[in-house]
Every structure is written in C-alpha cells, then in structure tokens.
Amino acid sequence: GVDENGKTLFVRARGKLKRDGELLVGDFVELSDSDGETVITKVCPRSNSLIRPAVANVDAIVAVIAPSPEPDLALVDKMLVNCKRAGIDCVICINKSDLGGVGPGEIEKQYGSDASAVVATCARRGEISELVAAIRGKLVCFAGQSGVGKSTLVNALTGEDRHKTGEISEKIMRGKNTTTSARI
C-alpha cells in the first residue's frame, strides 16, 4: 500500500477481506497495527471501480494502442463503454507514433466524442508531452494489449525503470506479457 504521504507500506489483508477478494488496486483502506504488522481492517467506499482492469478510485483510464501489434479497437470500445458507465475519463493514447499506422486524426474521428482526449506518444523517444497534459493531476490506470508500450510509457512518465519491458514477438506479432501486475 501507499500512505497519504506517498510512502510505500507493506500491508496484509486478513479475514473476510482476504478470503472474499474484496480489495482492488486503488482502494482506500483503514489500517491498524497488529503484532508488528500493518493490517487492512476496512475498505472505504469507492468513488468508482472497474472489473477489467480491476481498479478503484481512478480519475482516468489510459487506453494504449499502437501500430504494432495491430490495434484491437474492440478492446478500446469495451474500455470506453466501461469507463462511461463508471464515470471515469478515458484517454486514448496512440503509442509508437514513429511507426506510422493509425493516426490521432482517425482515432479522434472515430472516438473523439467518447474519449476525454486522444494523444500520440513515442515513449522510447520521450515524446510524451500530450499525454502528460491529458493526465496531469489525475490518478490513472494504463490498459491495453500486450506489447503496446504501457510499461515503457510508465517508465517514461516516472523517469524510473520500474517496469520490465520487452519486444514484440516476431513469430506471433504480439507482446510477450512482460508486465503482469497492477500497482498505483
């Protein structure tokens, strides 16, 4: 967990919370100390939540697509519908803009009225200013197909090498599921 000052805490869920799997990434919780351990005792009411990705209390989802692998626009459709239903902004981010392919204009035409913003980035080159402007001051979650550069974007935004990144498999032309965790 992360406390109100941004300090990382190691916490444990116990009892009903652990057994029933009621916790989501982004939940605000109450804690207590028990035998030298910090334990989650209560989940506070959520302002919003999604099942996929399994998150709570976010201001926006960044739906990341890229020219490679081929964009799954049905996935973008699902994210937009789920975000709208939950009252969460959805920013569509076209990463790897240096590779050509689908451009912001095409995506804007198709999704512009449903997305809170459509931005183009090239995380490997550090071209992320449009994304920074779209998410400034917001608690966001990145979602999208494997291999579109979600971890590379997070690394570029934080200035840290927090997340392992990989290449697109030439055999199957998809990402290799390098990142398999969720964290705030």
Describe each model-derived feature in a short phrase:
Residues 146, 151-152, 156:
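Walker A/P-loop
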Residues 46, 64-67, 82, 86, ...:
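Conserved, well-folded catalytic cores of nucleic-acid-processing
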Residues 82, 110, 184:
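Hydrophobic/aromatic ligand-binding patch that stacks against planar heteroaromatic rings
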Residues 74-84:
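Histidine-anchored nucleotide/phosphate-binding helix
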Residues 58-64, 85-97, 115-121:
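Conserved beta-strand/loop subsegment of P-loop NTPase cores
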Residues 159-184:
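Switch I (effector-binding) loop of TRAFAC-class P-loop GTPase G-domains
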Residues 98-148:
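Canonical P-loop GTPase G-domain recognition
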